[in-house]
From Swiss-Prot:
Renumbered ranges of motif 'KMSKS' region: 250-254
Broad class of where this protein is predominantly found: cytoplasm
Primary role: Catalyzes the attachment of glutamate to tRNA(Glu) in a two-step reaction: glutamate is first activated by ATP to form Glu-AMP and then transferred to the acceptor end of tRNA(Glu).
CDD domains found in the cross-reference section: GluRS_core
Alphabetized SUPFAM superfamilies for the sequence: An anticodon-binding domain of class I aminoacyl-tRNA synthetases, Nucleotidylyl transferase
Residues that, per the record, bind ATP: 253
GO terms of biological process kind: glutamyl-tRNA aminoacylation
Gene3D superfamilies: 1.10.10.350, HUPs (3.40.50.620)
Motif 'HIGH' region in this chain: 9-19
Keyword tags: Aminoacyl-tRNA synthetase, ATP-binding, Cytoplasm, Ligase, Nucleotide-binding, Protein biosynthesis
Name of the featured protein: Glutamate--tRNA ligase 2
Organism annotation: Brucella melitensis biotype 1 (strain ATCC 23456 / CCUG 17765 / NCTC 10094 / 16M)
Matches recorded under PROSITE patterns: AA_TRNA_LIGASE_I
Amino acid sequence: MTVTVRFAPSPTGYIHIGNTRTALSNWLYASKNNGKFILRYDDTDVERSKDEYAQAIAVDLDWLGVRPDRVEYQSKRFDIYAKAVEKLKTAGLLYACYETADELERRRKLRLARRWPPVYGREALKLTDAEKAALEAEGRKPHWRFLLPNFESDPFATQRTEVHWDDLVRGPQTVDLASMSDPILVREDGTYLYTLPSVVDDIDMGVTHIIRGDDHVTNTGVQISIFKALGATPPVFGHHNLLTTISGEGLSKRTGALSVGSLREAGYEPMAVASLAILIGTSESVTAAPDMAALAEHFDLASISKSSAKFDPSELDALNRSLLHEMPFEKAKPRLEALGICGAKAESFWLAVHGNLDRFSDVSHWWQVVSGDLPEAPDLSGEDRDFVRHAFDLLPPEPWNGQTWKSWTEAVKSATGRKGKNLFMPLRLALTGQAHGPELADLLVLVGLERTKSRRP
């Protein structure tokens, strides 16, 4: 058996880091088991689904390093779903209902008042052909419900009916079908809700493992019933915990702030995003994996907590810094060249500055510092200005090396009596225009004598 998984986003918005957790969990599981990963767009809602969102999802996944083995669009598979609908109708497992939303709400409230479970009472099963024809003559169109197998012979005499599965994350799970309403699979306009196309596609595409958020746990009992009704063996299920904001709110496509695209535009490394999306809320320590192979070594569905995990942007910042601080020059080189940072001093420049980067794009600023003019003149007080002028008069001749900074500052200390912060801070401001940054012993060599002299206030 070839392990086959799928990620099935709805292209009705941009995916966020919570969706990323699901996509990466599936992709890593397939990778570790020499399996296949299917990207399947749940675009049956033709009004809300947009091609621009589908394209954005593909770009986001590619940026994260997730490359599907197969791409499918549910909107192109309606004929297959129609055949499944007819099969269920023929078996007497899909029945027409005509209630409006208001009528269903009144019935729900009535059941609650009688202290009955607020589930659909299957009233539509009692309709005669004449009553159905009369309702349709009024202009009503039916929606179609799946008849859950929670009874023996009388569908109005429901009884506890347990569905069991061994969840890859949560262990043994049980849901009671008697506590649920028969799910609507087909809307009045003939379009399909999520449940039916999902099951039909999983069967048709040979999906063996379904890994998704734990907000789908209850759905699983229904879907297992539909798998069996269509004559298929249900796949293995795994439900990971969900990510929330730091305040505990659920993530949503509508918020946008934590969309993968916005994180990319903010300059985060893809492996910082991937590492946090996978390792947060697990028993594993949250560290920055340098690549997908390393992340796969830490990926274990059994290590996932059953409680939701809070996404803290500060953790993402820390992981991003860690990746940049540990990134070897050979890995950074193509990206540096794309920014015009090349030549004989490119490697020594990277080694000098990468330990101070928050974002990779910060290198452009430091390259300007060592290779061009300062973005703006440093703000030095009169006393510090005089001190820096004196210090620059003591600059040693070239050639310079890693010891030049030490020998120069020792000479300045002897000549001026300044030491510590009072000595180093004015020199740093004059040389770089910044109060903080990479080691000046490394930067000074890169700036060079002539450019350093040009920065004499």
